Amino acid sequence: MLGDRNEGMATIPALNQIQFEGFCRFLDQGLIEELSQFPKGNSFLEYFRDEEIDFQLFSKTYHLVKPLIKERDARYESLTYSSKLYVSAGFLWKDKRPQKKTICIGNLPLMNSVGTFIVNGISRVVINQILQSPGIYYGSELDYQGFTVYIATIISDWGGRLKLEIDKKERIWARVSRKQKISILVLSSAMGSNLKEILENACYPEIFLALNLKKECGFKEKKYAILELYAKYKDFTEYKDSLDFDFLCETLRKTFFSHKCELGRVGRQNINRRLNLDISHKNTFLLPQDILAATNHLIGMKFGMGTLDDMNHLKNKRIRSVADLLQDQFGLALNRLEDAVCDTIGRAIAKDKIPTLRHLATSTPLTTTYESFFKLHPLSHVFDETNPLTHIVHGRKWSFLGPGGLTERTARFRVRDIHPSNYGRICPIDTSEGIKVGLIGYLATHARIGDCGSLESPFYEMSEKSKRVRMLSLSSRKEEYYMIGTGNSLALNQGIQEEQIIPARYRQEFLTIAWEEVHFRSVFPFQYFSIGVSLIPFLEHNDATRALMSSNMQRQAVPLSRSEKCIVGTGFEGQVALDSGIPLITEHAGKIISTHTDKILLSVNGETLSSPLVLFQRSNKNTWIHQTPQVSRGNCTKKGQILADGAATVGGELALGKNVLVGYMPWEGYNFEDAVLISERLVYEDIYTSFHIRKCEIKIFMTMKGPEKITNQIPHIDPHLLRNLDKNGVVILGSWVEAGDILVGKLTPELVELSPEKRLIEALFDAPIGTTRQSCLKLPIWGRGRVIDVRWIHKGSASRSNPERIRVYILQKRKIKVGDKVAGRHGNKGIVSKILPIQDMPYLQDGRPLDMVFNPLGVPSRMNVGQIFECSLGLAGGLLDRHYRIAPFDERYEEEASRKLVFSELYEASKQTGNPWVFEPEYPGKSIIFDGRTGDPFEQPVIVGQSYILKLIHQVDDKIHGRSTGPYSRVTQQPVKGRARRGGQRVGEMEVWALQGLGVAHILEEILTYKSDHLTTRNQIFGTLLLGGALPKPEPEDRPESFRLLVRELRSLSLELNYFLVSKNKKNFNFWKMNRVEV
């Protein structure tokens, strides 16, 4: 991104470039770096000194072979898309002839063209992690007496922390654990320094001399210093003299020094920069010189010299991308390989055999390490394939969580909050909602990962000597030294720039300075935001929280059966669609020979190239991935031209929703509190119809009585449920199946105790008597569909640990219905509450009925006025047959620029169509509409227009649930909650209040007691409901189980709860006769 020849022009970088660059950096640098450090511990010569054995891997001679299977086949057959890694190795044993050979050390998963890895047929992506950069940081805090304590925190490459602190008595301590601390002189002595060196190099020797005179802080010899350090670190006080000194040194090296003092290359650079040291970058461990320099700087802080560090500044963070994570796993695999080689050599020596290179190296460590990493590591996610937007966004995700990072419960508000150094690098809007807010987010559109894991953002350099504009990428550390002009400078008149006063950023502050003082200016208005936020038109008119919701909900939009481009967009839709990999793009210029449903044939320089199409492929979110040709026979194509559109793309642009006619007005309470009223037209014309592909799977095990059998002969099963099975017992391709139908017929052998007669028959005829039970695969309750694919997956020979699998894929066609969730691009979301006939919907003055009716009260309180601008501009675009692409913050050109644009387009639409109601000067943007039921006009004008509305993946077919029978909680004996556990509907406080308000005391009693946690009564109710009659009344001693639980909890607090029964005679109450009953 440096030195673009096109002056003043900037192109948006590839949105998945970060993943590609990270994986290439791992192949070019990470692999060689880890191989060059093999073995990491003692060499094999030290392991086997008597045998003179050595084993080496040569780092610069590795190579990857071409994968045996294609990416498409790996996904279909549930395999891993990987390549074999070959490395040159050498083996030496005494005076034997040295062996040198290229060996395979395992399979390395490869990144595909989308930036993901395919592991066992599942696409996975490795997200970025933000950690505190290794180095030293100075801060201060108040002790329990209110005095200021200055602290220097040294963070290692592994995340370990060593704190140096100076208290009010000018005593300097090193905190080796949360509870224990030792004198800085003792730590320096344990690291190899003597008192003379310390005093000669100290800036304040008098403080160290005074410190040495104090008994608890005095200098000690190295042996006793190591002993005290070990005692404090391990909290060990007994048998000090009996411990071996060499053992203590080795233990401290492996635990304390390796965890807290290994800085790494980045940590060494940071400490040298902060403390003005000149230590070689190859020395990556903490040295006594570092401790002394850090102490000198800490004392200076005590005397008011120097500045404290901002731990949340982005210059003090580093990004662990896919390159770093894969390199760590490769190093772990090499450690396991080293252990395996040692074991193999040891066994060979015991048997007096000469091992060979072919038997020494095994591929198991590398293969299993990466498989467990992609399956179990918290930063390895299942790739979100809901729509093309998620294909791009997921790889640009970052997280503070994960190994070495923060936790959800302990992260403070200051860490979660927006920092000025984030601008242009981390999106200030797009983050998760809930407990992870601020801990997970997305990179800005132009952000890139630079050297040492820093985030960089591009800027235009403003040169005073020449008019040439050069583009440079600056990290947050370098940016502090320059005046950065904001996006407003883009709109300035080139002739009068010298006279302008513009806003700028300098050292995390916003200033107003003259144009000639600006060093750099922004490249693009969307530079500060993530991709999801960059797709929101009129973003500047929305509240930030609503923009956050919009960004999250766009990733939840399901691809529709017939996609449509938005009328009002931002111009970012094309880049997102192209980089997502969903459309099919030609790599060569040529001529179309023919187009088929499954492939496109292209003639290139006399050769025929076949481009296969993706047809009805299931995504990880059960949405469909499908490509349709956009070219015809005889067309000439250029390189980079789109041959086929995918799901949710039209003409190479992102198309997540539909342009529908909406109005903002209340309608009989059906759009109260974010409910949405829709027209039947959306159902009948399949406007919001989507396809979903569900997967059903069954495993075929090898049991003790033999293998399970797949058959269509299932005893004691209704033949109607078996109607779709073929002769092999598997459902027929193309069958229409309903809930409860058998998809795969399977019989499992059972181990049962036979009667004496059957055992006699077995002995006489020497044939076992088979007893089986049916364990068929049935279609779950989530509905009906069409079987589009059946896969029988074999992975090697079948065994108990490696069963065969049969997968059945079912296509569902879902129309929009009551309970589905819809949303706009401004955080305006709602649930469909009623589907009105077309003739009952409110209609415009030209007779067109509205498609959706939103509640107008949801706009002013939520401050997402951008939807009103989009609605009105969409109406003008629909009438004029125009599409608008509007960049945000257009007020930098003139005041009220958005309003003027919308009104001018409405006025032009009114003139060209001859409809004066489109733009009424008295109430611009509003119109008088009519009630479809009566034909009468409504009293007030209503805002109407065309908005781009999405259908979200939260659909009623996946949510609706009813409980007839199900499990109970063991503690409270109440029904469990949740659809997945067949739970019940929770009746909480507000529901109880509602029933109390209606006065339904008996129904309330039944819900809370008889049908809930009355153990005996709820069993009797079932028979009563079947046979009729009055509900049984519980006995006085039969109390609800939740009440018993409350009593037991009170007893645990030493509170005894009793109640008394008041006896009653025939005539009146006798309050003096009471029977005490313990609960």
UniProtKB/Swiss-Prot annotation:
InterPro entries, alphabetized: DNA-dir_RNA_pol_bsu_ext_1_sf, DNA-dir_RNA_pol_su2, DNA-dir_RNAP_su2_dom, DNA-dir_RNAP_su2_hyb_sf, RNA_pol_bsu_bac, RNA_pol_bsu_CS, RNA_pol_bsu_protrusion, RNA_pol_Rpb2_2
Biased composition (Polar residues): 966-975
UniProt catalytic activity: RNA(n) + a ribonucleoside 5'-triphosphate = RNA(n+1) + diphosphate
Disulfide bonds: none
Family matches, as SUPFAM superfamilies: beta and beta-prime subunits of DNA dependent RNA-polymerase (SSF64484)
Region called Disordered, residue ranges: 963-982
UniProt EC number: 2.7.7.6
Subcellular location field: Plastid, Chloroplast
Keyword Zinc: no
One Gene Ontology term, aspect cellular component: DNA-directed RNA polymerase complex
Keywords on record: Chloroplast, DNA-directed RNA polymerase, Nucleotidyltransferase, Plastid, Transcription, Transferase
GO BP term (any one): DNA-templated transcription
UniProt-listed CDD domains: RNA_pol_B_RPB2
GO molecular function term, any single one: ribonucleoside binding
Keyword hit for Transmembrane: no
Cited HAMAP family: RNApol_bact_RpoB
Function: DNA-dependent RNA polymerase catalyzes the transcription of DNA into RNA using the four ribonucleoside triphosphates as substrates.
Subunit structure: In plastids the minimal PEP RNA polymerase catalytic core is composed of four subunits: alpha, beta, beta', and beta''. When a (nuclear-encoded) sigma factor is associated with the core the holoenzyme is formed, which can initiate transcription.
Similarity comment: family membership: Belongs to the RNA polymerase beta chain family.
Protein's recorded name: DNA-directed RNA polymerase subunit beta
Organism from which the protein derives: Pelargonium hortorum (Common geranium)
